[in-house]
């Protein structure tokens, strides 16, 4: 090597040694929300919404059409009224417009809203894996949402809808995972295998005293202890199983608890369940913002026949107050997004962020307010606006992580700075 080459080599070493070291990228972890209330608060969530682009219904005549939970039998979300509102199967309209439950931007928006409102986790309204109707899409969407819960810092569990097996049986469509005919009990047992392996194995699955929590919206299909013994035979240790209020007896020793729900007697019914009803098992409280169903106008029968008006946030204040003042440790919020029954906590054109802001205040959420909830919508809008910009999406990834870490001021700087 000649002297000139040596000089260049030494210069290269010197420049390399003097180059500034790249700062390692900060790893941002989710942070738990601090609240005055020590009760666990879980949000009941529907995962059944489909758009024309995402509807993969097993029946070809529904493919490429809006999902039935946006349309029922009378509505068309493509029809927009003079106020810019979609014609959906509800008297209330999500701020985002009608959406696909598996949309990653919708999922991020919804989970961050729950987190910043003081919600500890999600109770997924869950169907069967029976490959009929829209059931496979609900499972797909649930899996998509669940996969993002840890990143945001939310726990979750499953609420099983055994009535869907009854519905499939009424049409002779109960099958196993390979689409071979099987019994209703066998179908439910196979569902429990999937729930055990896919969900209960996750580190953020909700447990009570060390055992996984499982709820049922009923029972409405299986009414004997022997049936539930068989259904639960897949578990090495049986889950802590809650049924609807007053419905646990048919399950025998398999049921350890009951949860309250929405009924026409409203607060009187909640008070009776919390304070008067003598029950040796566990109880779970509930709170809801109202109940106004769309079924009759949607062409799905004659409707429920009663309603509970929202009255602003008055109904929520009434029901949440009863739950917080009870001696029960868990509150289920009913619901995040059952638009057909008008029970949604999700921000709408009609109510804005009212229900989540009220939830923040009543739970005593610290260092967060309604402006932080609105930031979630700003993030969602930015995701959509800059969908084709990988550079901007990377910035929004950081903003999302900061929000999950409760560093909302920093996230706001990123989002507000995008248009500058």
Task: Please tell me what each predicted stretch does.
Residues 1-7:
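Bacterial N-terminal signal peptides that target proteins for export
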Residues 10-13:
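Short, linear, compositionally biased motifs with a strong N-terminal bias
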Residues 16-17:
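C-terminal motif of bacterial Sec signal peptides marking the signal peptidase cleavage site
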Residues 26-420:
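Glycan-processing catalytic domains of CAZymes
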